[in-house]
């Protein structure tokens, strides 16, 4: 991957969820991302990767309506109408990719993701022609992400100070997940299923589910996401 921000003149492919449904608030979240080590993914697996990404976005509609466009083959940008849920969506998008990578994919699947939360001054039919602070924060964040895989920037300095000091925890937690941990943490955090229901769905004992989720630090992740969502809710309401 040689960049992170959509370049003028690039023709994105669009995958929309609730294209014309937007919050009344002018504050939105923009998720800009690209696939980690995309150049090493075989051509025979590219279609499966894109399908997995789209399936994740469709399922995560339970958290917020969204619109996604892909460009350059390995990059994507998403407008998230409910910024409160943006970090949950971004982290669970990564977990979905990790958990659904083919067993024979040596390096697995993952994405580098930057979240920008702020105003959108102009919202066109296509994300490529839209503009605003949220887009700039998200694009700049991915350009500067270096070796990390998750970044968040908002239009509120107080929020940025708190998030900057702690977002590395979420990044490291998601990056460290095994395929099995990622699949279970997705059910617990994205679908918000109780452990007994996860056990029934996966055919594993509740004891096994609890042990795996604790090893994956799911309770700490859920607590952090709840704190982030409370913080963004507070500032969006000001």
Language-model regions, residue ranges each:
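Regulatory and interdomain segments flanking nucleotide-handling catalytic cores
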Residues: 2-6, 10-238
């Amino acid at each position: 991957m040689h960049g992170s921000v959509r370049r003028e003149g690039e023709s994105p492919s669009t995958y929309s969820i609730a294209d014309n449904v937007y919050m009344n608030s002018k504050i939105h979240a923009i998720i800009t991302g690209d696939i980690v080590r995309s150049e090493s993914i075989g051509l025979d697996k590219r279609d499966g990767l894109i399908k997995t990404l789209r399936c994740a976005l469709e399922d995560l509609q339970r958290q917020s309506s969204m619109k996604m466009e892909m460009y350059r083959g390995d990059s994507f940008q998403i407008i998230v109408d409910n910024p409160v849920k943006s970090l949950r969506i971004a982290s669970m998008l990564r977990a979905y990719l990790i958990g659904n990578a083919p067993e024979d994919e040596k390096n697995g699947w993952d994405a580098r993701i930057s979240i920008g939360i702020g105003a959108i001054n102009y919202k066109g039919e296509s994300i490529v022609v839209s503009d605003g602070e949220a887009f700039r924060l998200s694009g700049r964040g991915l350009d500067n992400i270096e070796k990390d895989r998750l970044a968040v920037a908002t239009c509120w300095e107080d929020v940025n100070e708190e998030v900057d000091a702690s977002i590395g925890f979420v990044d490291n937690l998601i990056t460290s997940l095994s395929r099995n941990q990622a699949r279970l943490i997705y059910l617990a955090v994205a679908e918000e299923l109780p452990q007994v229901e996860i056990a029934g769905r996966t055919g594993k004992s509740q004891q096994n589910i609890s042990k795996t989720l604790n090893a994956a630090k799911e309770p700490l992740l859920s607590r952090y996401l709840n704190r982030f969502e409370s913080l963004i809710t507070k500032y969006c309401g000001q």
